[in-house]
Amino acid sequence: MLELIKAIFLGIVEGITEWLPISSTGHMILVEEFINMNLSDEFMEMFRVVIQLGAIMAVVVLYWNKLFPFSFEDRIQIKKDTFSLWIKVLAATLPAALIGVPFDDKIDELFYNYITVAITLIVYGVLFIIMENRNKSKIPAISTFEELGYKAVLLIGAFQVLALIPGTSRSGATILGAIMIGCSREIAAEFSFYLAIPVMFGASLLKLVKFGFAFSQTELIILLTGMIVAFAVSIFAIKFLMGYIKRNDFKAFGYYRIILGLIVVLYFLAVR
């Protein structure tokens, strides 16, 4: 029962931090210091990634009308726009797939530690503040997906590669990259959500294959619980973020990242 409660809490953390540009990994590292689940290291490594499937389903549910191209009710142009969007999403996914698949274990081995997480939290926090100050009086050059060209898409994909380093935040890196090349905040955030679908499905499948699908009944219940909670919380987190950025910029998230990065450093220096 206690492990189930811990899984629920981790699902809440995942559902919030996966979509806000504040690094789910950074929060997981901190949370796991206080919530130590009585399960194997191999299962927990897989759990951290596969729990994201629940979060991803929230995007699919919320944006189904934009993502599903086979509705009989949609006009031809709408279907063409949907196919075009998917081609752009897949193109932006290529850089992360080419680097992430062969080097996944090596990246975790080298960078999954509190020092890396703290540095990336702070650095990207500063970059968000600088970017928003720079763009304060600028009108976005890209405010629709039709205006989002393939060069811009590949550049956003290159930023997503940076998110392979723990603490960066996948949504943070892609949103930052998209805004830097001229996207509006809404387009940047929404495209970041769509990019997560192939990337996180792929990462989850990779971890499941490595784990071997060999779950005990307890492990399966814990994994499904975490995924369901992550799905429910993600619905609210995504709606919150899209509503928030219509009226505000990303600077608050930048300051939050800096504060969290300092907390990570101070905490681990104190206990290690």
Curated annotation (Swiss-Prot):
Signal peptide: none annotated. GO terms for biological process: cell wall organization; peptidoglycan biosynthetic process; regulation of cell shape; response to antibiotic. The chain crosses the membrane at residues 2-22, 50-70, 83-103, 110-130, 148-168, 195-215, 220-240, 250-270. Keywords: Antibiotic resistance, Cell membrane, Cell shape, Cell wall biogenesis/degradation, Hydrolase, Membrane, Peptidoglycan synthesis, Transmembrane, Transmembrane helix. It is found in: Cell membrane. It comes from the Bacteria. It catalyses: di-trans,octa-cis-undecaprenyl diphosphate + H2O = di-trans,octa-cis-undecaprenyl phosphate + phosphate + H(+). It is an enzyme of class 3 (hydrolase). GO terms for cellular component: plasma membrane. It is a multi-pass membrane protein. InterPro entries: UppP. GO terms for molecular function: undecaprenyl-diphosphatase activity. Its EC number is 3.6.1.27. Disulfide bonds: none annotated. The keyword Coiled coil does not apply. Its main location: membrane. Catalyzes the dephosphorylation of undecaprenyl diphosphate (UPP). Confers resistance to bacitracin. Belongs to the UppP family. HAMAP family: Undec_diphosphatase. Bacitracin is thought to be involved in the inhibition of peptidoglycan synthesis by sequestering undecaprenyl diphosphate, thereby reducing the pool of lipid carrier available. PANTHER family: UNDECAPRENYL-DIPHOSPHATASE (PTHR30622:SF3). This is Undecaprenyl-diphosphatase.
